[in-house]
Amino acid sequence: MREEKILCTKFKTRSRKYSSYKGQVGKVAPNVVDRDFTATKPNRIWLTDVTEFRIKGQEEKIYLSPILDAYNGEIISYTISRHPTLELTNTMLENALKKITEADKEELIIHSDQGFHYQHSSWSCKLEENKIIQSMSRKGNCLDNSPMENFFGILKQEMFYGVEFKDYEELIKEIDKYIEWYNNDRIKTKLNGMSPVLFLSLIHI
């Protein structure tokens, strides 16, 4: 069905949203983005967050940490782990920064919520070292990072809710496949019916 761009949406009662907020444990950055997610070029506004998945009947969870480019909605980098550690988010960030130029870094804003990952010095110092502007949502305000929240909602409706996975290895493989498909094949109305990768390639020919 994905190849034909036809999707069957699966509905399920949603569990409580994962929150990485632990109070003020480090630097809280101002809300520079302020719900203006308009980016005139790629690598100007990156959005990030962490979401969790739990297979029915299992206590263990896995955590997904992606970076989304506000310009075309592409997932630039992501990591998956069985624990919501600093390594989860820091590795994702390091992998993303390898893909852009020094000039891009100086014009980049990275926006997140106030989760402990993003308040921690390992995150904020990495941004400062690369001359990247840090932006944070107001506490408990998901609309301040709505494109990222929307991506999580779409992902879970289209590949997770209502699907039975035998184990977490299978689920991780399906998340990998979904993000590959989302970037390269899933069309977006606001991108003139193109996928994020196709839109970017045609705009920059």
PLM regions and their residue ranges:
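Basic, flexible linker segments flanking DNA-binding modules
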Residues: 1-41, 141, 196-200
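An active-site-proximal beta-strand-loop segment
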Residues: 35-76, 83
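Active-site beta-loop-alpha junctions of metal-dependent nucleic acid enzymes
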Residues: 60, 79-103
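Conserved small/polar residues in nucleotide/adenosyl-binding loops
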Residues: 203-205
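Mobile genetic element proteins and their domesticated derivatives, centered on retroelements
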Residues: 1, 33, 49, 67, ...
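K/E-rich alpha-helical interaction surfaces of small helical-bundle regulatory domains
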Residues: 173-193
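RNase H-like two-metal-ion nuclease catalytic core shared by retroviral integrases
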Residues: 20, 112-114, 120-121, 136-156, ...
